[in-house]
């Protein structure tokens, strides 16, 4: 599929500090042996996330592109995705065999969503540190993303978050849509996320 229709484009969104860059790093490392992978990161005025991924050695630097969105980062993934589409087109020209491109959004609120013109699949990342009530607060990221990742589960006892409550609320808010608890520090949950992307992305 990727060779015929271009690479599978996977949007990764979520609030600041939820673990988007850590997830992107882990997914790149889990998939790079089998697939040709690249990343586009979005930051408001810097290329900090792209530089972090290079430091983490997620991928060779020529496969990681940082775009500076200015203003509201959600605009660059939704209303006017041209800056990201251009970055993907440039990557595709340089690396014609691309199978997967991860698009990491700038940290934003629960209302941020990806334009269907930009992302084939979307992952929304929240952290238990943001409060156990986050899943039930809803918002497009919680309810409409293809996969919800509830990250930093290991910190739940320290922030007073009940994972059982979060699981119940996520199941209710998302109906049949899947969600995964994860701990990116230890890599817990990464295998399930890769499996989801492989199956639902047609890889």
UniProtKB/Swiss-Prot annotation:
GO terms for cellular component: cytoplasm. Keywords: Chaperone, Cytoplasm, GTP-binding, Nickel insertion, Nucleotide-binding. InterPro entries: CobW/HypB/UreG_nucleotide-bd, P-loop_NTPase, UreG. It comes from the Bacteria. One of its GO terms (biological process) is urea catabolic process. It is found in: Cytoplasm. GTP binds at residues 14-21. One of its GO terms (molecular function) is GTPase activity. Its main location: cytoplasm. The keyword Transmembrane does not apply. Facilitates the functional incorporation of the urease nickel metallocenter. This process requires GTP hydrolysis, probably effectuated by UreG. Belongs to the SIMIBI class G3E GTPase family. UreG subfamily. Homodimer. UreD, UreF and UreG form a complex that acts as a GTP-hydrolysis-dependent molecular chaperone, activating the urease apoprotein by helping to assemble the nickel containing metallocenter of UreC. The UreE protein probably delivers the nickel. This is Urease accessory protein UreG. It comes from Rhizobium meliloti (strain 1021).
């Amino acid at each position: 599929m990727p060779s015929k229709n271009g690479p599978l484009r996977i949007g990764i969104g979520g609030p600041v500090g939820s673990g988007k860059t850590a997830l992107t790093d882990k997914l790149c490392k889990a998939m790079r042996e089998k697939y040709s992978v690249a990343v586009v990161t979005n930051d408001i005025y810097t290329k900090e996330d792209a530089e972090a991924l290079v430091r983490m050695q997620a991928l060779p630097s020529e496969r990681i592109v940082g775009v500076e969105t200015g203003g509201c980062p959600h605009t660059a993934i939704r209303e006017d995705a041209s800056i990201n589409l251009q970055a993907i087109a440039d990557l595709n020209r340089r690396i014609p065999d691309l199978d997967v491109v991860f698009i990491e959004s700038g940290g934003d609120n629960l209302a941020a969503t990806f334009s269907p013109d930009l992302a084939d699949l979307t992952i929304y990342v929240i952290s238990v540190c943001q409060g156990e009530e986050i899943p039930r607060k809803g918002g497009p990221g919680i309810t409409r993303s293809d996969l919800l990742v509830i990250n930093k589960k290991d910190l739940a006892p320290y922030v007073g978050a009940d994972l059982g409550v979060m699981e119940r609320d996520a199941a209710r808010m998302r109906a049949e849509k899947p969600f995964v608890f994860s701990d990116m520090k230890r890599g817990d949950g990464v295998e399930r996320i890769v499996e989801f992307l492989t199956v639902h992305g047609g890889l």
